[in-house]
């Protein structure tokens, strides 16, 4: 907080993938959210799996994806329920064809979530998602 405005911010930090030990994104989320919390702000992380490990006081909203990288073969991830949700089918088909759809599909799922929750936050601080769905917030 600064001298001009001593009101704490309500900050949302999206992260499509937040592995707590590798890759950097999950590690970044933990360190930055801890610092924001120490400054007196309210912080919530919305993440796909793998989920980050966060300090006490930082809320985690889990926004599941198909987590296709956890399968030896993406063909094994197929379930008929994929046909019900277009975003799930898109994620699966894109993965099968060598695409990296996680940022896009996370953004679309987050946009749906955000329609119900956007007024709870003052700031959205994105680290790496860069998804079109963020614009919809």
Kindly give the residue locations of the regions a language model identified.
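A conserved catalytic-core segment of Leloir-type glycosyltransferases
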Residues: 6-8, 46-114
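Short, conserved loop/helix-junction motifs that constitute active-site signature segments
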Residues: 137
């Amino acid at each position: 907080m600064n001298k001009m405005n001593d009101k704490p911010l309500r900050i949302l930090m999206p992260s499509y993938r937040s592995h707590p030990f590798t890759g950097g994104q999950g590690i970044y989320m933990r360190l930055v959210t801890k610092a924001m919390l120490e400054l007196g702000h309210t912080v919530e992380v919305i993440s796909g799996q793998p989920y980050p490990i966060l300090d006490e006081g930082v809320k985690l909203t889990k926004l599941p994806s198909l987590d296709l990288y956890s399968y030896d073969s993406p063909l094994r991830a197929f379930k008929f329920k994929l046909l019900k949700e277009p975003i799930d089918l898109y994620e699966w088909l894109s993965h099968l064809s060598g695409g990296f759809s996680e940022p896009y599909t996370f953004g679309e799922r987050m946009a749906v979530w955000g329609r119900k929750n956007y007024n709870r936050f003052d700031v959205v601080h994105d680290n790496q998602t860069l998804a079109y769905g963020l614009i919809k917030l």
